[in-house]
Amino acid sequence: MKQGKNKRNNTQNLKEYIQQLAQTGIKELTDIVFPPACPVCGGVLGFEKGRRRQICPDCDNRLEYIGEPRCMKCGKPLKKTDTQQFCYDCTVKRHFYERGVAVFAYTDGIKQSIYQFKYHDKREYAAFYGRQAAQQCGALIEKWDIDLVLPVPMYAAKQRKRGYNQAELIARELSKNLNLRSEER
């Protein structure tokens, strides 16, 4: 009886392995025929150290990542000389959330990328944004002891028109990269 059960498990494991291998092979073949584009400039992404780049080197050098010091409420960058923990906006305006964090300064390249992502069906950009959020803010998210990533819902009519909720796609990628639970509403 035990031998039959092991044989079934081995067969199931082999099936899963072959399916995963086929999916990986199809993805790699698709990447060769239709190489992914840089989520900032739209150029073809090359390889670095045998792996496909997430972003082209020129755009990577131009992106402004937000590090410390940052506002303890909304995550906006603060000047290195600031002794305050909050930006001006957060001292004069009440927010309906506890904490926020931003990965990038909202400069031209990112503005255009976000616009393409939201309004021109560039769903594939979610992987880049999710990975960057995990890399740049993962330690902070871990420090906050977050156990669930919940995307901001969209108005139903907007989501029907667009076909997807970009916050949901990023939340899925972020949770995958940080091994957190994610729920979609």
Q: What is each stretch, according to the model?
A:
Residues 1-183:
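Glycine-rich phosphate/pyrophosphate-handling loop used in enzymes and phosphotransfer proteins
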